[in-house]
Swiss-Prot record:
Statement: the UniProt record of this protein carries the keyword Phosphoprotein: yes
Protein name: Citrate lyase acyl carrier protein
Keywords noted in UniProt: Cytoplasm, Phosphoprotein
Predominant subcellular localization, coarse grouping: cytoplasm
Organism: Lactobacillus helveticus (strain DPC 4571)
Subunit structure: Oligomer with a subunit composition of (alpha,beta,gamma)6.
A GO term from the CC aspect: cytoplasm
Cell compartments where the protein resides: Cytoplasm
Protein family per UniProt: Belongs to the CitD family.
Record function comment: Covalent carrier of the coenzyme of citrate lyase.
InterPro entries: CitD, Mal_deCO2ase/Cit_lyase_ACP
One Pfam short name: ACP
Keyword hit for Chaperone: no
Length: 97
């Protein structure tokens, strides 16, 4: 699967995460901002990476701003941004979740 456009999903509200994705060429590169990065940063990055790979994306630049989102929210936002970036919103692949 290929990223066709830069896309954003999520908000900056409490218990949410905002994810922006754009084309990349060095695997999945994640720039994470989070108040809980020290404790949960590795887990947040793992959830984003696994979800993108399950969706078929191997190269992407990801900017994530976490406000205390649970894993299920991170997965949902990652799937939404991947669908928007690949312009496949009309063909949702919920198996990824």
């Amino acid at each position: 699967m290929e990223i066709k456009t830069t896309a954003v999903a999520g908000t900056l509200e409490s218990s949410d995460i905002q994810i922006m994705i754009s084309k990349g060429s060095n695997g999945i590169e994640i720039d994470l901002e989070s108040e809980v990065k020290k404790a949960y940063g590795d887990q947040i990055e793992k959830v984003i990476t696994e979800t993108l790979k399950k969706y078929g994306l191997e190269n992407a630049k990801v900017k994530a701003t976490d406000k205390g989102a649970l894993d299920c929210v991170i997965k949902a936002r990652t799937l939404a941004v991947a669908q928007r970036a690949t312009e496949t919103q009309d063909k949702p692949d919920l198996e990824v979740l």
